C-alpha cells in the first residue's frame, strides 16, 4: 500500500505554494522574491541556547508595538506572516463548513493555507483597476469567516482604497474577520490601517520583517489585532514559535537604530523603483509598467515567456505571473540595487526591437 493512501484527501490533492526558492534558478541577480538585495549584519547577544525561548519574546513584542503604534496586548509574533495566515484559519474556520475569501490576483498563500486545513477557498476577482469589487463580495459572504486583503497587493503593487477597506469592514461586522496583509507597508506607511484597530474588533493586520527590514531568512512576522483576537491566536500557536537567535536579531532590528536603517533602505528602494519604472517604459518589449507602492514592479511584456527565459539564462531571475488571473504577459521584478536594475534594463534593451525613443532615466 502506498503511504499516500494514508494521507488526508485534501493533502493528496494539494498543490504546494510555488515559492521563489522552490522554483529555483541559478542566477546571481535574484529579483523574484521581493527580498532586500544586501544582507544586514547582526551579532548574537543571547547565549542561553540550552533553554527554551519565551513563547512571545517580551522585548520583540514591546519594540514592535511601539513601532506599530499599538498596545503590546495587540501584537502576536510568529514564524513569518505566513504562520499568521494559518493561525487565523485555525482559530476561526471550521473545516468543511466555513470559507475564506480573497480577491485575485493576489498572494498565493491564502489559498494554500485554506486548502491545507480543509477550508473552502472563495474568490471574488478584483476589478480591472485591482480594487475591491464590493458588491460582488457582499453577494459572496455566506459561510465566510475570513477575508484576506493584501495592501499593497502582491503582485500588482497597488494600495487598496481606504474607503473600500472601511466599507468592507462594515460589511463584515458580526460575520467575518478581515485580515489586511501589510507585508509591504513600510514602503507606504501612511496607508497602514493599524490605527483602526480600536474601531474594528474583527480587524487583523499581518506584518513581517522579511521585506523592508531585510530579514527574509529570519522568518519573523506579526499579527496585530485587538486583545480578544490575539488571545484566540495564542491558543493555537506553537509554544515556542521564535528561536532565541531569531528573537535576538528581531529585537535588534526593531531598535531605534534598526528602524532608522530600515527607513534608509526604503528611501533607497523607492529611488531605484522610480529609476527602473522609467527605464522599463523605454524598452520596446514592455507594453506597460504598473505603478507600485512596494519594493517591486509589475510589467506586461510583448513576449513575456521569451523575456523570462532570456533573462533567466543570463542569471537574472524574475517572477512569472502569467498564471495569475488578469496578468497574462506579466512579470514581477523585485527592486534590487541600482546595478541589478541596470542589468535588467541592459538585458531587455538587447532583445530584438531595441528601445523606444524616449528620455533616459536620470
UniProtKB/Swiss-Prot annotation:
<dbReference type="GO" id="GO:0000105">
    <property type="term" value="P:L-histidine biosynthetic process"/>
</dbReference>
<dbReference type="InterPro" id="IPR004839">
    <property type="entry name" value="Aminotransferase_I/II_large"/>
</dbReference>
<dbReference type="InterPro" id="IPR015422">
    <property type="entry name" value="PyrdxlP-dep_Trfase_small"/>
</dbReference>
<dbReference type="GO" id="GO:0004400">
    <property type="term" value="F:histidinol-phosphate transaminase activity"/>
</dbReference>
<comment type="subunit">
    <text>Homodimer.</text>
</comment>
<feature type="modified residue" description="N6-(pyridoxal phosphate)lysine">
    <location>
        <position position="211"/>
    </location>
</feature>
<dbReference type="InterPro" id="IPR001917">
    <property type="entry name" value="Aminotrans_II_pyridoxalP_BS"/>
</dbReference>
<comment type="pathway">
    <text>Amino-acid biosynthesis; L-histidine biosynthesis; L-histidine from 5-phospho-alpha-D-ribose 1-diphosphate: step 7/9.</text>
</comment>
<keyword id="KW-0028">Amino-acid biosynthesis</keyword>
<dbReference type="InterPro" id="IPR015421">
    <property type="entry name" value="PyrdxlP-dep_Trfase_major"/>
</dbReference>
<dbReference type="InterPro" id="IPR015424">
    <property type="entry name" value="PyrdxlP-dep_Trfase"/>
</dbReference>
<dbReference type="Pfam" id="PF00155">
    <property type="entry name" value="Aminotran_1_2"/>
</dbReference>
<keyword id="KW-0032">Aminotransferase</keyword>
<keyword id="KW-0663">Pyridoxal phosphate</keyword>
<keyword id="KW-0368">Histidine biosynthesis</keyword>
<protein>
    <recommendedName>
        <fullName>Histidinol-phosphate aminotransferase</fullName>
        <ecNumber>2.6.1.9</ecNumber>
    </recommendedName>
</protein>
<comment type="similarity">
    <text>Belongs to the class-II pyridoxal-phosphate-dependent aminotransferase family. Histidinol-phosphate aminotransferase subfamily.</text>
</comment>
<dbReference type="GO" id="GO:0030170">
    <property type="term" value="F:pyridoxal phosphate binding"/>
</dbReference>
<keyword id="KW-0808">Transferase</keyword>
<dbReference type="InterPro" id="IPR005861">
    <property type="entry name" value="HisP_aminotrans"/>
</dbReference>
